């Protein structure tokens, strides 16, 4: 009887953990009516696995279940490779070499920039590009320490904005580290180009802002590599008086309003900075309909 109770307890624990996670296993498609949970179709398989696990441990001398046995998904702050692969699947063919870095982003072209030679002199400049649908698609810049902005946005008149880019269907109070679905995601970051005369570094510049997940925009650690992490490398280089060629591209599929990913490249004149990466526009606690930005909470 004790063994039976132990098995039933294990089964209940597994079902409680597995069912909520099932809805987080895939990204939404680009079709506006296809944003859906996978919970219903996953229950039979999950129940079978849980029952098998309970039966296996019926003769065990311990009732404890560790994390390795449960194989719980999405316990890291960055999206899993499976989650990210789902988001970028339609754009993978645009890259000859793409490798997941184990911390949320992808290495492009063996991490080698394609920006060409960088001269160790000249004035900084920055420019944006939009497509025929008005979507922010790319930002190019030549950066020096002169371009760096050290003051905060409120001090330079570039504070919070009520303007929203296409697909910006915000969701608040999400579980986990990243509590919002979206940020106003910049192509060229304020701290990098905010001191270039004539460049609009505000959060309401439609040429420089697109809908980006909070994770993709803000993650900034070596083991959690969102856009801010790579911008940090460039900020440090500029603070050391280096000259950096910099490019950021938002990559869309068809007429979708929300980009699937952001490609970031940087190269310094002395060669100490040279990277080429792809940051997927996804997040652990949401599913995204890239066609219109609709969000479904999945944890």
What kind of feature is each model-predicted range?
Residues 111-127:
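N-terminal post-signal-peptidase region of extra-cytosolic proteins
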Residues 19-23:
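C-terminal motif of bacterial Sec signal peptides marking the signal peptidase cleavage site
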Residues 14-18:
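Alpha-helical transmembrane segments
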Residues 2-11:
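Bacterial N-terminal signal peptides that target proteins for export
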């Amino acid at each position: 009887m004790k063994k039976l109770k132990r098995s039933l307890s294990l089964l209940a624990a597994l079902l409680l953990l597995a069912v909520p996670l099932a809805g987080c296993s895939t990204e939404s498609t680009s079709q506006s009516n296809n944003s859906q949970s996978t919970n219903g179709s996953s229950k039979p398989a999950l129940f079978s696995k849980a029952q098998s696990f309970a039966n296996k441990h019926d003769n065990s001398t311990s009732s404890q279940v560790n994390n390795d046995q449960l194989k719980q998904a999405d316990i890291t702050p960055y999206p899993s490779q499976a989650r990210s692969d789902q988001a970028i699947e339609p754009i993978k063919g645009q890259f000859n070499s793409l490798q997941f870095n184990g911390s949320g982003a992808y290495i492009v072209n063996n991490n080698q920039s394609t920006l060409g030679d960088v001269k160790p002199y000249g004035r900084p400049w920055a420019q944006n590009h939009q497509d025929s649908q008005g979507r922010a698609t790319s930002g190019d810049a030549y950066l020096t320490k002169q371009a760096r902005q050290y003051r905060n946005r409120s001090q330079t008149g570039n504070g919070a904005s009520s303007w929203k880019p296409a697909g910006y269907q915000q969701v608040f109070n999400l579980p986990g580290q990243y509590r919002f679905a979206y940020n106003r995601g910049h192509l060229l970051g304020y701290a990098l180009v905010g001191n270039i005369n004539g460049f609009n570094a505000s959060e309401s510049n439609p040429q420089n802002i697109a809908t980006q997940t909070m994770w993709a925009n803000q993650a900034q650690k070596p083991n959690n590599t969102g856009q801010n992490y790579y911008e940090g490398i460039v900020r440090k280089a500029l603070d050391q008086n280096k000259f950096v060629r910099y490019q950021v591209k938002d990559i869309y599929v068809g007429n979708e309003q929300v980009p699937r990913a952001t490609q970031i490249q940087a190269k310094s004149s002395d060669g100490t900075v040279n990277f080429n990466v792809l940051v997927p526009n996804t997040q652990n606690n949401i599913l995204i309909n890239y066609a219109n930005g609709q969000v479904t909470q999945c944890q």
